Structures are given as structure tokens and as C-alpha cells.
Amino acid sequence: MQIETSRFGTLELGEDVFIHFPWGIPGFGALKRYVLLEHRSGPFQWLQAVDDPTVAFVVCAPHVLGYRYSLPSEKADPIELDQPDDLAVLVMVCFDRENKSLRPHLRGPLLLNASNRKAYQLVIDAPELDQVLEKVEKP
């Protein structure tokens, strides 16, 4: 299937690589299908909406940021997780242009069942998880 993206142009992808968010992502509820695309280099990836070429999020594994989640098993119930090894956790990362910093959204991890490709965003009420990842200096 061909999908259009504003960052990567037209891509030919099989539907077996799609990640299904049955409830969408908060703020983007109408978009249910996404695909993970590699970034040029480093630990980051793009979570690209299949049905809207302009919607894509920078994501990475939280362990890259030195953070690990300890989640009760029932938090994975919405994605029908049978095997703990099938759980992948990603966090969205945004670039704050004003402060030249990267901000991981640790209060909203994305939980993905790698076996059935279902995912959802878990919202955690924990203000202490708000943090700046690093200052980015101009060369």
C-alpha cells in the first residue's frame, strides 16, 4: 500500500507493518493507523500516521533517556498482551525551539503489542515526569 508523508514522500508499505491505535492518540482520535519509520541516525524514530501525511511524532524507547517504566500488568489489557516480551514502550519527544531543548513526554508512554500490532497511549498523572532531556546548542 502506498502512503503519502510530508517528511519522507511516498512510501510503499505492507499493512502488516501498521500499528493500530483503536482509540487513536489523544488529540488525534480519528487517526488509527500508524507506522514506525527510522530517523536518519540515533535512537529516534518517526511514528507516522498512515491516513494523514502531515501527522508524525518523533519517538524513542524510554531506556535511551535513562528511564524505565514499571507498569501493572492490567495497563496492557487494552492491547491484549499475552506475552510480556511482546510489549514495546515508546515515548514521544518534542523539540522546544524557544528553549532549544528536547522534551520527552514521559507522562504519556505509548504501549505497543508487537505481536498483534495494537497500541495505545497511557496517560500517567505524575508531574515529576516532566523534564528537559538536554540543552541543544547551536554550532
Where on the chain are the PLM-derived regions?
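Long, compositionally biased stretches
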Residues: 1-66, 84-139
